[in-house]
Amino acid sequence: MKELTKRQNEVLDVIKDQILKTGMPPTRVELAKILGFRSANAAEEHLKALARKGAIEILAGTSRGIRLLGEHQHNEKAHQDGLPLIGQVAAGEPILAQQHIETYYDVDPALFHPSADFLLRVQGESMKDIGIMDGDLLAVHKTQDIKNGQVVIARVEDDVTVKRFYREGRQVILKAENNDFGPIKIDLAYQSFDIEGIAVGVIRTADWM
């Protein structure tokens, strides 16, 4: 990796700090605010420079599409007492914010592939046809590197939802696995959209407890 300038190191440090604090990278607007840039475009230029030097990868189609590379990658695994269980997520707040964590489950992240970073309590029956039931604990691997057809945990505007992901150009379609629920269509040019991770397994609470 090429040597970074002082300013680029500052940007990189903010990205790392935000991932550790909130569980996800900052948006361009957040970077600009923290570092005192005049606009999100200035933050974008610094991100492009970091990508050219091999420190990060920029993932298209999401406002938090930043992935650390090489020596800068974090091992953001489970709390020492197990995987955090996320319950109700408040609008506009990071999914791994402390106030969203109900408890910790003593479960090995390596039981899942790729390994799980947290558990999410499923609400509703929109994915029941593939065995994801209301009240289940969904094992989630934090990533924004996704492919069409994967089951994702997505944030649409201020709502967090579990759906099957498809992208067609500037449009994202989130499909339920239950005929009672229609697809959610997102225009990336106008709507706020982020990926929190992909589903890697299910724990049925009645069996686990």
UniProtKB/Swiss-Prot annotation:
Its EC number(s): 3.4.21.88
UniProt signal peptide: none
Entries under Gene3D superfamilies matching the protein: Umud Fragment, subunit A (2.10.109.10), Winged helix-like DNA-binding domain superfamily/Winged helix DNA-binding domain (1.10.10.10)
Molecular function terms from GO: DNA binding; serine-type endopeptidase activity
Coiled-coil portions: none
A Pfam family recorded for this sequence: LexA_DNA_bind
InterPro entries tied to this protein: LexA (IPR006200), LexA-like (IPR039418), LexA/Signal_pep-like_sf (IPR036286), LexA_DNA-bd_dom (IPR006199), LexA_repressor (IPR050077), Peptidase_S24_LexA (IPR006197), Peptidase_S24_S26A/B/C (IPR015927), WH-like_DNA-bd_sf (IPR036388)
Active site residues of this protein: S126, K163
GO terms under biological process: DNA repair; DNA replication; negative regulation of DNA-templated transcription; proteolysis; SOS response
Keyword set, alphabetical order: Autocatalytic cleavage, DNA damage, DNA repair, DNA replication, DNA-binding, Hydrolase, Repressor, SOS response, Transcription, Transcription regulation
Domain of life: Bacteria
Catalysed reaction equations from the record: Hydrolysis of Ala-|-Gly bond in repressor LexA
Binding partners and assembly: Homodimer.
HAMAP family named among the record's database cross-references: LexA
Similarity section: Belongs to the peptidase S24 family.
Name the UniProt record assigns to this protein: LexA repressor
Gene symbol of the encoding locus: lexA
